[in-house]
Amino acid sequence: MANRGGRHARTEETENAINYVQCDGLAVMKMVKHCHEESNNMDLAQGALLGLVVDKCLEITNCFPFPKSGDETMDEEMYQLTVMRRLRRVNVDHLHVGWYQSSDVGNSLSLALLESQYHYQTSIEESVVVVYDTQKSSRGFLCLKAYRLTPQAIQMYKDGDFTPEAFRNLKVGYESLFAEIPIVIKNSPLTNIMMSELNELLPEDKGHNFLDLGTASVLENHMRSLIERVDELYQEAVRYNKYQQVVFKQDTEKHRALAKLAAENAVRTSKGEPTVSEEEVIKQFRPMPVPARLTATITSGQINTHAQHIAQFCSQSLAKLFITESLQNAKEAKEIK
């Protein structure tokens, strides 16, 4: 995945290094174009973000796509360095400040996303990941969000410990893996003038389909994804419950063996014989490896995201239904008159 970095000097993570992200309209259009092109092929679009940091504001001024992973002859790191070197020659911002990727059905949180952002954020302190939801944007809602790993998530990855105890000690949950950074889009005055002129050229019957009710496929996709994630979380819960049962059984057998050894040692002591150390019994019971809970945490976050999207979608659809009903009643009343 996108575990590439333009700078390799490792820096210490500081909290609230970036207050908000400012993205140029040109960079947004290039990201949108790339993500929609790849979505037609059911591929995940990824690319690099270029810009600079000014007073805790990350300004994204340009971007370029990563080569497709299927091309084995392509040296991805050399490709990025070559692109940034050529941008520098034409006096374009060439500092690597993060990466972007597409998302479908709001399902952006994944293990690959966490790993990639960890590599970026530990090598480029101010880096962010920008996620573009192609499906939601295609319905007329520009969905562009910027995220950074929280200090707790960074520390957890550095320790490499994903056990339940580590999650509890660091107070890490699916809601605290990423911190969303506010993102604003800035256009030049000339761009704003052009947008105003294009808006006047738009036909009146275009761009106003706000009461479109043909959105059953959106809810269906969200529900299907939600069911799949719930099933995955159930399988994770079954595996963890089996681990707990094995640990409980092992502890019971160990306590029984230690109690038996204590009784035997008491008899040996009364006979003046040497006792057997408890270490001999403990060695027979090897500790069970604790299963990692990172996958279950990510799956829980995906379930929460789908549930929020379904709730938002249903509330919007209900509002459309009530508005449409009122308009239909008004139309029928007018026809009767």
From Swiss-Prot:
Molecular function GO terms recorded: metallopeptidase activity; translation initiation factor activity
Annotated keywords: Cytoplasm, Initiation factor, Protein biosynthesis
Primary residence: cytoplasm
Pfam families assigned to the protein according to its UniProt record, in alphabetical order: eIF3h_C, JAB
CDD domains (UniProt xref): MPN_eIF3h
SMART domains: JAB_MPN (SM00232)
One of the record's GO cellular component terms: eukaryotic 43S preinitiation complex
UniProt key word Cell division: no
Places the protein is found: Cytoplasm
Gene Ontology biological process terms, A to Z: formation of cytoplasmic translation initiation complex; positive regulation of Notch signaling pathway
Name under which the protein is recorded: Eukaryotic translation initiation factor 3 subunit H
Domain MPN, first and last residues per copy: 21-153
InterPro entries found in the cross-reference section: eIF3h (IPR027524), eIF3h_C (IPR045810), JAMM/MPN+_dom (IPR000555), JAMM_MPN+_peptidase_M67A (IPR050242), MPN (IPR037518)
Protein's job: Component of the eukaryotic translation initiation factor 3 (eIF-3) complex, which is involved in protein synthesis of a specialized repertoire of mRNAs and, together with other initiation factors, stimulates binding of mRNA and methionyl-tRNAi to the 40S ribosome. The eIF-3 complex specifically targets and initiates translation of a subset of mRNAs involved in cell proliferation.
Subunit-level organization: Component of the eukaryotic translation initiation factor 3 (eIF-3) complex. The eIF-3 complex interacts with pix. Interacts with mxt.
Homology family: Belongs to the eIF-3 subunit H family.
